[in-house]
From Swiss-Prot:
The gene is MICAL3. It comes from the Eukaryota. The bivalent Mical/EHBP Rab binding (bMERB) domain, mediates binding to predominantly Rab8, Rab10, Rab10, Rab13 and Rab15 (in their GTP-bound forms). Residues 1239-1258, 1456-1467 have a biased composition (Pro residues). This is [F-actin]-monooxygenase MICAL3. Residues 2-494 are annotated as: Monooxygenase domain. Its EC number is 1.14.13.225. A motif (Nuclear localization signal) lies at residues 663-684.
Length: 2002
């Protein structure tokens, strides 16, 4: 520790930290220059710079980064940096792609210079990241620079942050970066090369810049512009007018904001209802919208022009886009209002304030972009040669391929192109010939536009610059050098360019020409003659008169599908009937739209040749590859069925689109078209079919119309097949449904009844104008222009594959509005819509958003108040002139351009100012965050860094307390219950916000961990779950569907919960501690990774992360804190009260809590208030006074003056507020509150203390109550907060376990202990540096802080004590959770003196905090798992873990604010027991605290009260019956919330284990007897976890593993088990360490804290698996066992890990990993979910069966009186149920522990007794199952979220492609009409029968058919997506519902469940049918398409560049 201590004083290390933490471009460059100057390094020496820097900077924080960069640089492709040693490169633009390219080139050994014309990174816009980009950036050390990088479910990052990350990496690698240098052109080498060999140079501004002298041979354009470098021709894809609006709002990181769900892309085709509601409410008409929560709230939306005109954003309508979007034509104020309104509505008015961030001109950050034209370069590179010097010119990023933003392809494809370019430069440098280099580059580039997350290689770890590692089926030699000769420019011949281009086109698209042969009429005619040969009455001689009778058409159909037509019955004379029959069958069965009616055909003299060519071409394309039925007479029935299906099934565009680089992607290619022929039709049918199924017969009309729609067009012909199939499917689906004949004709119905008044096929049904063949569409027997085919209600353009038709009034509707057709609603609504678009629209919006008549006024007003600039800027902006570029650069209107003149005068706002305004909340915590992240840059950082950072956030008060308070209150009012509101009020809005921030941060961090473990999808869910878990206990009680309640509450409380996260403040403390711990841990962890022996921190980090996660869990608990949280608090209080009879208030609460959680929250608030006011505290904390007397560890560590100071610092008022809303307050007071928190913590401890009123330190609980903190109002205020900041709270925590405190103090408190802790936590030291300020604010002196950090580790010190004997770690958590327990553990560890002394918990604050966090998380998990139980046991736990618990449950913390109610008379022993335990066996004392926490059940006397309380709880929260369910929810949240929590779910159980600590456990273990006497009071708890129970748990886990179908899930579970075991082992090892200091203690500890033993058990070889599985699988069981206290897999492992990491870096890291692995089980869960998604039914079965089992088990548990409080109480009943098993398990674990840690039998006995004490909290099989179920549910939720995001992105892609198709069709129609007019002589030139024109006509017809098929494929894909999405949502809902036992549901609920199941089965059927068709087609195409590469190429080049 000493080394690290001094390390931080090393100026180089300080400078490095400053560099890593820099938040601006200039700041980064300056910090780096200072670092280089100090180290005397010169970046100019690029070859050795990095190695010199590495050798000179021997800093543990930097080593983690070196390890990552060394790993990347060691790849074989880089040839150790010698691949490009003499290559000089210039890169234009320091954007993400330019910098990414520079990094790879530098690793190749090239000299790289980057020039950037600005010196600020000001783009707040957020980029979506594909999984491989996240992996890639992590490999470059992104987490080292930006701790929050892709935390949790987050898969996006702001451009600014991404640039900063890459800039820092580039600088470290020795890349020269010059800012304020603008590239203006290339300077060719002079002709006179004899005198001076000068090569290519750049013309830059300023001209005198040294870069102007730089000669290079490679130049790469990465500035995003279209014309920077010459020679690149562009392909343009013009889609529908697409106007994108981006807006950035300030993110204050409040809880309210944290709970708003992101919108990862809502595409209109995917969720039409949302957009229609938006339009009706606000008049805003969007095509899609995306919302990402990053440094800012980032929105990007595509607005429809008409909507912008209606809302006054665009003043005048111009056809020219440049004029349309010119600055003069845009009302900036209206634009701001539009963006704000859309953002407000899309987030359901949940964002408290929408204040615009500012751009780099100080204007509101809103911009409009024209996405109508997307450009892609035709080639990626070229070579120029002048005067003997060759120059390789390349493009990357947007300059190469412009992305369509909503699809998130920009960075992904940009990075792929960057790596491809690096590979090209490598080949160039290795001497490959220029043409070969170019040919390879272009071969690779053709695949780039087609890449999707699904069709790139999935093995991200193998990615390198070699394209083969990234593109699955790439042929790098696809193009030959001769085909790219035109890209070699010698400046001599310009003609070669054109020649070569034509050559390339002819060579590269061999298949495009294949269809041209069809263009010849003779070929088509010949085919028709062959098909009709032999049919009576049919003689085809031409393409007109031969077809008039209709027999020829019927003959072709009969030839291939004799089942459809009885040819022999046809009458040659009945022309109309024959033709109509053929048209109808072709449309219905084959998907070929008619071009006229039978009546028309009969009436015309000669059928129109052009029309017939178009119509017959579709038959040709459909059947050309099929065998006629006559050739299939020898086929069996099966084969025939397949054949028929082949003409029906939709093309499998789906598979091509998503799975492989699409061969069919580009409908343009003719070959493609050929290939698609058959499939296209099918697709169409499918798409319609998809829709049809949706309608069902009742909606059939809609379907019919839909089907009709399918008759896409003449071209659609084939589609109709699909439609037909759809119809068939529909019919199948609807057979059971009542047929509804609303007048809407089924698609299948023949449309013989053509209206007589129709003008025929050449007159538009809608506009009555002429319809030319090429532009003709037909549906329902009507013909019309494509542009006229609109919804009667909303005027949206319809597609043939998706419409509804009302036969009665002959009107067409989009499906969503079909229901309005009869109601007159349409008439009413339509007009309304128009007004809506005006101010009226604003009105409704305002209502929704609580705005004034000025739809935006209120929001604007408030936002303006907050950001005065926004309004003003907005006004100014309208005048801003748009910047027009001479070249067609993308038209973008950025607000800063006030006018052309003003623009010049406009001054750029410094980046710092911009950041300060936009990121105030982030930056406040940012510095610390950054520090934390930088200091723990190790993997831990990666895994848990976010957590640290997030906590830091809370310290900053973003908006000012009053504003924040207002916001908080507003949020609370909006989404919280009254209780929640009260809580929030008591907390104080400011604090709330901070807490919210913290919570958000913490959640993110938690998520980060989760994500790292489970990947991004789950994190989001985690958050929700956390919030949900935080759901009001009351609600939980009341709501049978705990999960739903949780979700609802989660949402409602989110603000409160977040605020409870205010615990966030504690989190902050935790964060600080975590930072201390975690950063060091991270750092250490990384070091460990690097092999640094001092990497203890790494594990700590993990632990911290876990702790953080628990914090998150706590947060979850807290989240509910306002409502649920408070309820929880009350519940806990009630439990505490039961524990502490002394506190009548609490006792009252106990029952009242159970009965009226609402009141509880209020009381909680009061409690918090007491915390606020010492006087209140006094009475409420009477027991606390004892603790106070004892002095919270903090006080002990820090003189009282300090504490008071801290309290004042804590902003006693704020703290009071915080106390009011414990959770919220905490965040606000975080730093200060933390210190006060420690007193507060004691307060929470007081419940324990109350429980054990005895003044002895042991009754930490009681003592803590009396603890100084209790006296100190500030601390009281901070209790909640400090809880979140367990480190600080840790002190109180220590007091809680006074003995522990003493021990800790001895350990931590004593200088030696502190030093030891410090050594263990160099990271802590670093953290200190980072959190020194926080600590100071907390009131801790830096020294104290350092102690704290040590103690932080001590918390881990606590843990250290725990760590030494791993049980201690648990015990610390137990301490955290059950302070007494931890204390006793320390005693066991041999910290007997801590018993009396208040532990130096304050010192271990951070660690303690962490522990607390872990404990809290455990508790939270407990609370989540036990729900009320948590609260009940929580009281003691609160006392003990008030810090951690407080953190974890702000609500729970409420008791801390007010001393927890005295334990019930029986329970009081909890504290006493703790004392006893501590006294008898030090560890023993500690365990009792846990029992205190969980003691209720454990304490026999208290147990009945607890059970009663729990019962009341259960009664109040009906869930108690499923306390497990509650646990589930909590667990889910917890797990989701934090990885720790996940394991902590079992921790939740820990408290329970504490019960098991009771003699029963000991007895079971056989050691109990010894401990029994000591722990006899806890004996009741004994049954908690027995060895048997553990075995059961393990077996259960294994069984689950077997039942789990997903291999990934199974693996994850196995990993978790092993991890748990490892962790336990690790904890065992750490314990031994502690044991070394206190061998007996270590041993004692293990017995002492069954939880620990459980952990140990897990650790133990014997119990490892069991414990692990138990912990993982059935945390309850684990909990019951030693896990109960800490064993819970996550909790225990997390804590043990932390401790171990404190003491043994390596192990910590491993443990960390195991933890991660442990998490993986959840991940496996996710995998399971994925599998489930694949096989919905089986998945549901597996998941649901799990649930059911769990539920049943839960029910059984519930049956036990205690069960209701399944958390802590899970009670004696359950514990009793599994006492023997648990005892056995515990014995085993203890045995293993003893084996592991040389625990003496006494120790083991002590442990068993402790275990037994905890054991009462032991989990029964059901509980374990319930926990596992919860885990699976969580994983499932995360998986579902991930899948949902994927679907959304796919939907966006489809939407974009449909737009492109529409635009292409429009252009084709224009050309087709012109050709048709010429052919018909209508062009004024007379009738021309020009063969060239006819040839052109054939080509156009084919193209149109291809487009129609392509569109139908897209629609099928969209339909499949829709069904998939629906199924997923139903599945999730069903899963949530089935998590509740049937007997708890009402009839209505059961019937709803049945309905959902039925609907889901229907959807599954539809999907199965659809997928079967698609798969069939896919197989056929594989047969047909042998030349995949060629097809890809054709598609690639004609591909739409989205």
């Amino acid at each position: 520790m000493e080394e690290r201590k001094h390390e931080t004083m090393n100026p180089a290390h300080v400078l490095f930290d400053r560099f890593v933490q820099a938040t601006t471009c200039k700041g980064t460059l300056k910090a780096f220059q200072e670092l280089c100057d100090h180290l005397e390094l010169k970046p100019k020496d690029y070859r050795s710079f990095y190695h010199k820097l590495k050798s000179k900077l021997n800093y543990w924080k930097a080593k983690a980064l070196w390890a990552k960069l060394d790993k990347r640089g060691s790849h074989k492709d880089y040839k150790k940096g010698k691949a490009c040693t003499n290559t000089k490169c210039l890169i234009i633009g320091a954007g993400p792609c330019g910098l990414r390219t520079a990094i790879d080139l530098s690793l190749l050994g090239a000299k790289v210079v980057v020039i950037e014309k600005r010196d600020a990174f000001s783009r707040n816009n957020v980029l979506h990241l594909w999984p491989f980009t996240i992996h890639d950036l992590r490999g470059l050390g992104a987490k080292k620079f930006y701790g929050k990088f892709c935390a949790g479910a987050i898969d996006h990052i702001s451009i600014r942050q991404l640039q900063l990350i890459l800039l820092k990496v580039a600088l470290i690698l020795g890349i020269e970066i010059h800012v304020n240098v603008e590239f203006q052109g290339l300077i060719q080498p002079p002709e006179d090369q004899e005198n001076e060999r000068i090569g290519w140079r750049a013309l830059v501004h300023p001209k005198t810049h040294p870069v102007s002298e730089y000669e290079f041979e490679v130049i790469i354009g990465g500035d995003g512009r279209r014309n920077t470098l010459e020679g690149f021709r562009r392909k343009e894809f013009r889609g529908k007018l697409a106007i994108a609006i981006t807006a950035n709002f300030i993110n204050r990181n409040t809880t309210a904001e944290a709970k708003v769900e992101e919108i990862s892309g809502v595409a209109f085709i995917f969720n039409q209802k949302f957009f229609q509601e938006l339009r009706e409410a606000t008049g805003i008409d969007l095509e899609n919208i995306v919302y990402y929560k990053d440094d800012t709230h980032y929105f990007v939306m595509t607005a429809k022009k008409q909507s912008l005109l209606d809302k006054g954003v665009i003043l005048h309508d111009y056809a020219d886009t440049e004029l349309l979007l010119s600055r003069e034509n845009v009302d900036q104020e209206a634009l701001l209002s539009y963006a704000r309104e859309a953002a407000d509505f899309s987030t359901q008015q949940q964002l408290p304030s929408l204040d615009f961030a500012i751009n780099h001109y100080g204007q509101p950050d809103v911009a409009m972009f024209d996405f109508t034209c997307m450009y892609a370069s035709e080639n990626a590179a070229l070579v120029r040669e002048q005067n003997g010097h060759q120059l390789l010119v390349a493009l990357v990023g947007d300059s190469l391929l412009e992305p369509f933003w909503p699809m998130g392809t920009g960075i992904a494809r940009g990075f792929l192109a960057a790596m491809d370019s690096a590979w090209m430069v490598r080949s160039w440098s290795l001497g490959t010939s220029p043409l070969e280099v170019l040919a390879e580059r272009e071969s690779i580039y053709r695949l780039l536009p087609q890449t999707t997350p699904e069709n790139v290689s999935k093995n991200f770890s193998q990615y390198s610059i070699d394209p083969v590692t990234r593109y699955p089926n790439i042929n790098v030699n696809f193009l030959r050098p001769s085909q790219v000769r035109h890209l070699y420019d010698t400046g001599e011949t310009k003609d070669i360019h054109l020649e070569m281009e034509s050559l390339v086109n002819s060579r590269t698209t061999p298949k495009l020409t294949r269809n041209e042969s069809v263009a010849r009429s003779s070929k088509l005619l010949g085919w028709c003659q062959r098909q009709t040969d032999g049919y009576a009455g049919v003689n085809v001689t031409d393409l007109t008169m031969s077809w008039k009778s209709g027999l020829a058409l019927c003959a072709i159909i009969h030839r291939y599908r004799p089942d459809l037509i009885d040819f022999d019955s046809l009458d040659e004379q009945n022309v109309e009937k024959n033709n109509q029959l053929a048209f109808d069958i072709a449309e219905k069965e084959l998907g070929i739209s008619p071009i006229m009616t039978g009546k028309e055909m009969a009436s015309v003299g000669e059928p129109d040749k052009l029309s017939m060519v178009m119509y017959l071409t579709q038959f040709y394309e459909m059947f050309k590859d099929s065998l006629p039925s006559s050739d299939t007479l020898d086929l069996n029935a099966e084969e025939k069925a397949v054949l028929i299906a082949s003409t029906r099934s939709p093309i499998s565009f789906l598979s091509k689109l998503g799975q492989t680089i699409s061969r069919k992607r580009s409908p343009k290619d003719k070959k493609e078209k050929d290939l698609d022929g058959a499939g296209k039709r099918r697709k169409t049918s499918q798409s319609e079919e998809e829709e049809a199924p949706r309608g069902h017969r009742g909606e059939r009309p809609t379907l019919v119309s839909t089907l009709t729609d399918r008759r896409m067009d003449v071209a659609v012909g084939n589609q109709n097949k699909v439609k037909y199939m759809a119809t068939q499917l529909l019919a199948k689906f609807e057979e059971n449904a009542p047929a509804q004949s609303i007048g809407i004709r089924r698609q299948g119905s023949m449309k013989k009844e053509f209206p007589q008044n129709l003008g025929g096929s050449d007159t538009c049904y809608f506009c009555q104008k002429r319809v030319y063949v090429m532009e003709r569409l037909s549906a329902e027997g009507k013909f019309f222009h494509r542009s006229c085919f609109k919804c009667e209600y909303c005027a949206t353009t319809l597609r043939l594959s998706a419409y509804a038709y009302d036969i009665e009034d002959g009107k067409f509707y989009c499906k969503p509005h079909y229901c309005y057709r009869l109601s007159g609603y349409a008439q009413r609504k339509r007009p309304a819509v128009a007004p809506l678009s005006g101010k009226e629209a604003k009105g409704p919006l305002q209502d929704g958003a609580t705005t004034d008549a000025n739809g935006r006024a209120n929001a604007v007003a408030s936002s303006t108040e907050r950001t005065p600039g926004s309004g003003v800027n907005g006004l100014e902006e309208p005048s801003i002139a748009k910047r027009l570029r001479g070249t067609p650069e993308r038209i973008e209107l950025e607000n800063y351009r006030l006018s052309l003149r003003q623009a010049e005068a406009l001054q750029e706002v410094p980046e710092e100012t911009q950041a300060e305004h936009n990121l105030s909340s982030v930056l406040d915590t940012g510095a610390e965050e950054d520090v934390a992240s930088s200091s723990s840059e190790s993997e831990m950082e990666e895994e848990g860094e976010e957590e640290e950072e997030e906590p830091r956030l809370p310290p900053s008060d973003l908006g000012g307390v009053p504003w924040k308070e207002a916001v908080r209150i507003h949020a609370l009012l909006k989404g919280k219950s009254e209780e929640e509101l009260e809580a929030s009020k008591s907390f104080g809005p400011g604090n709330e916000e901070e807490e919210e921030e913290e919570e958000e941060y913490e959640e993110e961090e938690e998520e980060d961990y989760d994500e790292e473990e489970e990947e991004s999808s789950e994190a989001g869910n985690q958050r929700l779950q956390q919030v949900m878990h935080a759901a009001d206990p009351l609600e939980i009680q009341a709501d049978v569907h705990w999960t739903h309640i949780r979700e609802r509450e989660e949402e409602e409380r989110m603000a409160p919960a977040s605020e409870s996260s205010a615990s966030g403040a504690p989190l902050d403390e935790n964060d600080l501690e975590e930072d201390v711990d975690s950063e060091p841990a991270e750092i250490e962890g990384e070091a460990a990774e690097d092999g640094d022996p001092g990497d203890t921190g790494a594990e700590l980090d993990d632990d911290q992360h876990w702790s953080d996660s628990p914090s998150d869990a706590d947060r979850e608990l807290r989240l509910p804190c306002p409502a649920e949280g408070e309820a929880e608090l009350e519940l806990r209080v009630s439990e505490d009260e039961e524990k502490l009879p002394a506190s009548p208030k609490h006792q009252e609460r106990g029952p009242s809590q159970a009965t009226s959680p609402i009141r509880s929250p209020q009381e909680s608030a009061l409690l918090f208030i007491p915390v606020h006011s010492p006087s209140t505290e006094g009475p409420q904390l009477p027991p606390v006074p004892a603790a106070t007397q004892e002095k919270s560890p903090e006080e002990r560590l820090f003189p009282e003056p300090l504490l008071p100071k801290e309290k004042p610092k804590a902003d006693a008022p704020s703290d009071l507020k915080a106390v009011h809303s414990p959770i919220r307050s905490q965040p606000v007071t975080l730093p200060e509150a933390r210190t006060p928190v420690s007193p507060g913590s004691p307060q929470p401890q007081p419940p324990v203390a109350a429980s054990t009123p005895p003044p002895s330190p042991l009754p930490i609980c009681s003592q803590p109550q009396p603890s100084t903190e209790a006296t100190v109002p500030s601390p009281t205020q901070s209790p909640i907060r400090f809880q979140p900041a367990p480190a600080k709270t840790s002190t109180p925590l220590a007091p809680l376990p006074v003995q522990s405190q003493s021990d800790t103090k001895d350990r931590l408190g004593s200088p030696l202990a502190v030093d030891e802790a410090l050594r263990r936590s160099d990271l802590v030291e670093e953290f200190w540096m980072k959190s020194a300020e926080i600590r100071r604010s907390l009131g801790l002196t830096p020294v104290d802080r350092s102690k704290g950090p040590e103690p932080s580790f001590p918390t881990p010190a606590f843990r250290p004590v725990s760590l030494k004997s791993y049980s201690v770690e648990k015990s610390p958590q137990d301490e955290g959770l059950h302070l007494l327990k931890p204390l006793s553990i320390p005693k066991r560890l041999g910290l007997p003196k801590p018993e009396g002394e208040p532990l130096s918990l304050p010192t271990p604050r951070s660690p303690s905090d962490r522990e607390l966090r872990s404990a809290q998380e455990e508790r939270r998990e407990l609370s989540s798992s036990s729900g009320l139980g948590l609260h009940g046991s929580s009281s003691n736990m609160k006392t003990l873990g008030s810090q951690s618990f407080n953190t974890s449950d702000s609500a729970m913390l409420t008791p801390p604010s007010s001393p927890p109610p005295p334990p019930p008379p029986g329970e009081e022993p909890a504290t006493l027991r703790r004392k006893l335990r501590e006294a008898e066996p030090n560890a023993s004392v500690v365990p009792p605290p846990l029992p205190a926490t969980w003691m209720r059940p454990p304490r026999e006397p208290a147990q009945p009260p607890r059970e009663e309380v729990r019962k009341s709880f259960v009664e109040s929260v009906e869930e108690i019956p499923f306390a497990d369910d509650v646990e589930d929810t909590y667990d889910d949240k917890t797990e989701d919330s934090s990885l720790q929590e996940k394991f902590f779910t079992p921790p939740s159980c820990w408290p329970r284990p504490e019960k098991p600590r009771h003699p029963p456990l000991a007895k079971e273990n056989g050691r109990l007897p010894a401990l029994e006497g000591t722990l006899q009071p806890q004996k009741r708890g004994l049954p908690l976890v027995s060895a048997e129970a553990k075995e059961l748990a393990e077996e259960r886990m294994r069984a689950r593993e077997k039942s789990v179908k997903s291999q990934a899930l199974r693996d994850a579970m196995a990993r978790q088990l092993s991890r748990m075991q490892q962790m336990e082992l690790a904890s065992g090892a750490p314990r031994p360490r502690k044991a070394s200091s206190a061998p007996s203690q270590g041993k004692e500890r293990r017995p002492d804290s069954p939880t620990r033993p459980t952990l140990r058990g897990s650790e133990e070889p014997t119990l490892k698996h069991e414990a692990t599985s138990e912990e993982v699988l059935s945390p309850p069981s684990d909990s019951g066992g030693p896990d109960g206290s800490f064993t819970s897999s996550e909790g225990s492992s997390g804590k043990s890990k932390k401790r171990s990491s404190l003491f043994s870096p390596r192990r910590n890291k491993k443990e960390k990993k195991s933890k991660g692995e442990g998490r993986p089980p959840e991940k496996p869960s996710s995998n399971l979910l994925e599998e489930a998604a694949a096989k919905p039914k089986s998945l549901w079965k597996s998941v649901f069966s799990g649930y059911k089992k769990d539920k049943k088990k839960k029910a059984d548990d519930k049956s036990c009186p205690s069960t209701p409080s399944s958390g802590a109480t899970v009670d004696s009943g359950k514990h009793r149920v599994l006492p023997v098993v648990r005892a056995e398990l515990q014995l085993r674990r203890q045995l293993s522990f003893s084996e592991d840690s040389d625990l003496s039998s006494d120790d083991v006995l002590e442990k068993s007794s402790q275990k037994s004490r905890r054991e009462p909290r032991t989990y029964t099989e059901e509980e374990l199952n319930a926990k596992l179920t919860r885990r699976v549910q969580k994983a499932a939720r995360r998986q579902a979220k991930q899948e949902e995001l994927k679907r959304l992105h796919r939907a966006q892609i489809i939407q974009r492609q449909l737009q492109q198709v529409e635009e292409r069709q429009r252009r084709l129609e224009e050309r087709g009409v012109a050709v048709e007019k010429a052919l018909r002589g209508e062009a004024g030139m007379g009738k021309k029968d020009d063969p060239k024109l006819m040839q052109e006509w054939f080509k156009l017809v084919q193209e149109k058919n291809a487009m129609v098929r392509y569109e139908s494929e897209l629609m099928i894909f969209a339909r499949e997506l829709e069904l998939e999405d629906r199924q997923s949502r139903l599945q999730q809902e069903l899963r949530e519902r089935m998590a509740v036992e049937d007997h708890l549901k009402t009839e209505e609920e059961l019937s709803e469940e049945k309905q959902i199941l039925n609907e889901m089965l229907e959807v599954v059927e539809q999907r199965d049918s659809l997928v079967a068709l698609l798969e069939e087609q896919r197989l056929r195409e594989r047969e047909e398409d042998k030349d995949l590469e060629a097809a890809m190429l054709s598609k690639g080049f004609s591909l739409n560049w989205s």
